[in-house]
């Protein structure tokens, strides 16, 4: 079985980390000082939080990093027992060939409040022998007593140019010919998520060792941006029936979900506003309509009916504005 590329090409050192230069610079200072306070990485998936944690641990702990490093995923182990047992057992052991031990707890925002309180107590108890690296998508879900005990690092989505450069490197290493348009579409759909981008690249690779635009669409099951923009333009220009027919083709024939389509609607409307194709006052109204549609779909309403109703509201934007 082939190794997933996301693991095969995971950066092993802080110098190899892509797109988080300021954060890497701050982490390198910890390596120089050979000390580590409790820290928290926060940001969306695929932006380098786990990679930075592993690279930092290897740099600080050296050849014995595996013996002195504990990684837990809070999605798999959310309860108080995990905090009290696994973390406590690990922290009680003396560091082997290293100045201290490191506990990396991923997806901490999925832990219950009681488990977070238990974690806070363990962080206080073993502060002289162990350091904690906490990772989460939403720091607002972490209790204040934990946040106040951590240096917080906020990870931004990785820039498109950095992701494309990395994808080209991987394609070159694997002997794959990737179309530029295919790479650009991967970046468009992943919105700064390096992990997802690499997974799509691997899944889109054909038996002929090529990555084409069509192969990318087959993997991600999303509508082409130009088709979404065509629907929006038709609706804004009062051609509702044509817009509705295009929408139905995408949902029924291509099998694109309502959740994905409403996200793409937002992306295209935002892009068109940036390009000054949609006035800001109209953008505000469109956002209101799209957010209402998104809410209704998530609450269980029929996605196609909600999106068709959204298109009918698009017809009203110019006269409302």
Swiss-Prot record:
Keywords from UniProt, A to Z, are: ATP-binding, DNA replication, Nucleotide-binding
The answer to whether keyword Protein transport applies is no
Which is a Gene Ontology cellular component entry for this protein?
Answer: DNA replication factor C complex
- The residues that hold ATP are 43-50
* Membrane-spanning intervals of the chain: none
Molecular function in Gene Ontology = ATP binding; ATP hydrolysis activity; DNA binding; DNA clamp loader activity
Q: Which GO terms describe its biological process?
A: DNA repair; DNA-templated DNA replication
Record's keyword annotation contains Nucleotide-binding: yes
Q: Which InterPro entries match?
A: AAA+_ATPase (IPR003593), ATPase_AAA_core (IPR003959), DNA_pol3_clamp-load_cplx_C (IPR008921), DNA_Rep/Repair_Clamp_Loader (IPR050238), P-loop_NTPase (IPR027417), Rep_factor-C_ssu_arc (IPR023748), Rep_factorC_C (IPR013748), RFC_lid (IPR047854)
Top-level lineage group: Archaea
Please describe the quaternary structure of this protein: Heteromultimer composed of small subunits (RfcS) and large subunits (RfcL).
Family per UniProt?
Belongs to the activator 1 small subunits family. RfcS subfamily.
For this protein, the record's PANTHER family field holds:
REPLICATION FACTOR C / DNA POLYMERASE III GAMMA-TAU SUBUNIT, REPLICATION FACTOR C SUBUNIT 4
Provide the function of this protein. Part of the RFC clamp loader complex which loads the PCNA sliding clamp onto DNA.
| NCBIfam families membership | PRK00440.1
Q: Which HAMAP family match?
A: RfcS (MF_01509)
Question: Which protein is depicted?
Answer: Replication factor C small subunit
Q: Which organism is it from?
A: Methanosphaera stadtmanae (strain ATCC 43021 / DSM 3091 / JCM 11832 / MCB-3)
* Taxonomy of the source species: Archaea, Methanobacteriati, Methanobacteriota, Methanomada group, Methanobacteria
Gene this protein is translated from = rfcS
């Amino acid at each position: 079985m082939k190794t997933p590329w996301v693991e095969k090409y995971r950066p092993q050192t802080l110098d190899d980390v892509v797109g988080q230069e300021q954060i890497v610079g701050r982490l390198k200072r910890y390596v120089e000082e050979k000390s580590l306070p409790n820290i928290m990485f926060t940001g969306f998936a695929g932006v380098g939080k786990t990679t930075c944690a592993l690279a930092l641990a290897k740099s600080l702990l050296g050849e014995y990093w595996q013996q002195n490093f504990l990684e837990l995923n809070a999605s798999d182990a959310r309860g108080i027992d995990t905090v009290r047992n696994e973390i406590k057992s690990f922290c009680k052991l003396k560091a082997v060939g290293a100045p201290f031990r490191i506990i990396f707890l991923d997806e901490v925002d999925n832990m219950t409040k009681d488990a977070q309180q238990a974690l806070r107590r363990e962080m206080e108890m073993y502060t002289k022998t162990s350091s904690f690296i906490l990772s989460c998508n939403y720091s607002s879900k972490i209790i204040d007593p934990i946040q106040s005990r951590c240096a917080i690092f906020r990870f931004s989505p990785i820039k498109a140019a950095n992701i494309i450069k990395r994808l080209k490197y991987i394609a070159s290493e694997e002997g794959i010919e990737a179309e530029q348009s295919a790479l650009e579409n991967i970046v468009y759909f992943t919105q700064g998520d390096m992990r997802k981008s690499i997974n799509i690249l691997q899944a889109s690779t054909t038996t002929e060792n090529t990555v084409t635009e069509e192969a990318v669409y087959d993997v991600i099951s999303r509508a082409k941006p130009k088709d979404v923009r065509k629907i929006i333009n038709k609706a804004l220009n009062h051609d509702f029936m044509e817009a509705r027919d295009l929408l139905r083709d995408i949902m029924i024939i291509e099998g694109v979900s309502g959740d994905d389509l409403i996200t793409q609607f937002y992306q295209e409307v935002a892009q068109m506003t940036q390009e000054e194709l949609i006035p800001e006052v109209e953008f505000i109204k469109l956002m209101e309509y799209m957010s209402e549609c998104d809410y209704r779909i998530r609450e269980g309403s029929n996605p196609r009916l909600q999106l068709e109703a959204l298109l009918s509201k698009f017809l009203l934007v110019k006269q409302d504005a």
